[in-house]
Amino acid sequence: MREIVNLQAGQCGNQIGAKFWEIISEEHGIDSNGIYVGDSDLQLERVSVYYNEASAVTRSSGGKYVPRAILLDLEPGTMESVRSGPYGQLFRPDNFVYGQSGAGNNWAKGHYTEGAELVDNVLDVVRKECENCDCLQGFQLTHSLGGGTGSGMGTLLISKIREEYPDRIMNTYSVVPSPKVSDTVVEPYNATLSIHQLVENTDETYCIDNEALYDICFRTLKVSNPSYGDLNHLVSLTMSGVTTCLRFPGQLNADLRKLAVNMVPFPRLHFFMPGFAPLTSRGSQQYRALTVPELTQQMFDAKNMMAACDPRHGRYLTVAAVFRGRMSMKEVDEQMLAVQNKNSSYFVEWIPNNVKTAVCDIPPKGLKMSSTFIGNTTAIQELFKRISEQFSAMFRRKAFLHWYTGEGMDEMEFTEAESNMNDLVSEYQQYQEATADDEFDPEVNQEEVEGDCI
């Protein structure tokens, strides 16, 4: 089957990853020891996308299912908490790869010094996992861009895997620094250096933002003091939604490559804004029967987006929607068309039919139907602009730079990363303003393109 190898790097990546495996295991009826306890053949039909079946424990019980997951960090702390967590016994012990020194929120340590020493060990495990696959579809990495390990070592790993498996899809779930909530002073540096790598080396990057997740918890879910567990739960719902079609039968299937082909009009513009519906508070779920129109409306709502950008400030280049549950295909098609017609000014006119829909028959646990939203919108430039402004403010004064140059980095790298990110913003802006009649000349200097959001 089309397998996906999951990598989780750093503290944030491992915490999101751990939650993701909880949700996926529940959907496939696999308990915390990797034993199948489900009640439907559909759960096992394509379980091999994310799980490797180890040898049978006893004749009657069948095998143990082991996640195709590689957990890495530069300090042992998070690994220990994953290992002692509810699903800690699920993972293959050899797939925990960690150092002792930590990256200290320093991208250079993760990318050039500490991380570079550990990366070969990780690649050995990656090769071993890939050899266990019949037909590897690609990789997914969960990490944050603000710290040291997830950002520095995560991007190093991406470029190494890209060299070795150039024709496989590389998918990342990247937690970007929030506008108001900041964990680390040097977040803008780490994020800019990471985005510089992601632009070149990934096929699809889902931008997730803690602040947007907090807002969803406060406003929509009515959770008064959300924990990281609540936030990670939201992220893992999206992750599970994106790969549903690979794991369960459906009427209209999508896989990572189909998504990439439909979602990425230009190779550099592969940063997506994810969303999920229905977001109802935990207690009230079972009291509401959702309809397809409600799902669609909620899914396109700015309040449901998991990145702190307002899609109304830009235009959608492309959109993908993955619906789950028993529903009428006709109704889904009509609703998606209605959204496009009603809000046509928010979709670029030069990509007709720019909404891709997939429908899978099996709903997530506890819901009758749900939908996952993936939008490639020019409004994502707000996110890059924000990081760029914070980066420039510090870099102008060369604040904190000695931590990076001390690990062997050069100032030139910072300048390059900054201009690459500014180019990205200009490209988004350029396509936001383009109309179907424009003669597109790629030679036009992108710096000249300016203008206000619609």
UniProtKB/Swiss-Prot annotation:
Keywords: Cytoplasm, Cytoskeleton, GTP-binding, Magnesium, Metal-binding, Microtubule, Nucleotide-binding. GO terms for cellular component: cytoplasm; microtubule. InterPro entries: Beta-tubulin_BS, Beta_tubulin, Tub_FtsZ_C, Tubulin, Tubulin/FtsZ-like_C, Tubulin/FtsZ_2-layer-sand-dom, Tubulin/FtsZ_GTPase_sf, Tubulin_C. Residues 435-454 are annotated as: Disordered. Mg(2+) binds at residue 75. The keyword NADP does not apply. Pfam families: Tubulin, Tubulin_C. It is found in: Cytoplasm, Cytoskeleton. GTP binds at residues 11, 75, 144, 148-150, 210, 232. GO terms for molecular function: GTP binding; GTPase activity; metal ion binding; structural constituent of cytoskeleton. PANTHER family: TUBULIN. Tubulin is the major constituent of microtubules, a cylinder consisting of laterally associated linear protofilaments composed of alpha- and beta-tubulin heterodimers. Microtubules grow by the addition of GTP-tubulin dimers to the microtubule end, where a stabilizing cap forms. Below the cap, tubulin dimers are in GDP-bound state, owing to GTPase activity of alpha-tubulin. This is Tubulin beta-3 chain. It comes from Drosophila melanogaster (Fruit fly). The lineage of its organism: Eukaryota, Metazoa, Ecdysozoa, Arthropoda, Hexapoda.
